[in-house]
Regions:
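Alpha-helical segment of the N-proximal tetratricopeptide repeat
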Residues: 3-33, 49-50
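Register position in tetratricopeptide repeats
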Residues: 16, 50-51, 84, 118
């Protein structure tokens, strides 16, 4: 019997192969079975982001965080969506929250460096991007 976890794994496999439309379908099926599956929700949001649908992705991450406010991956991806939407101050705040939960999250550190670069703060950008190399 297929369950939400099955479709989440299928979504992850499709996402890893950069088949974002397929991953979106699989995550939607997972969420149809279990609407509170935070892993499928984050995968769905990431797929939407990969398809350039950043506003929609942001809404998915916000919904995920209502289910689990301490899910650092949802926070990190919300920060990335905010960055794509040029909401840089909000992105830094959200990425800081993700880093409180998981201080060694190299992706969150990298995204924070990217945000600072986009804000024109090259000193902080270099710090966070080079921190990723340590």
């Amino acid at each position: 019997m297929e369950n939400s976890e099955f479709w989440t794994i299928r979504g992850n496999d499709s996402f890893d192969q950069e088949k974002f439309e397929d991953s979106l379908i699989a995550y939607n099926l997972a969420l149809k079975i279990d609407p509170r599956n935070k892993y499928a929700m984050v995968g769905r949001g990431a797929s939407l982001g990969a398809l350039g649908k950043h506003e929609e992705a942001l809404k998915v991450f916000e919904k995920t965080l209502k289910i689990d406010p301490t899910y650092d991956v949802a926070l990190r991806n919300k920060g990335l969506s905010l960055t794509h939407l040029k909401r840089y101050s909000e992105a830094i705040t959200v990425l800081n929250r993700a880093l409180v939960l998981n201080p060694k999250d190299s992706r969150a550190l990298y995204y924070k460096g990217i945000v600072y670069a986009k804000m024109g703060n090259n000193q902080k950008a270099v710090y966070f991007l080079s921190d990723n190399l340590r």
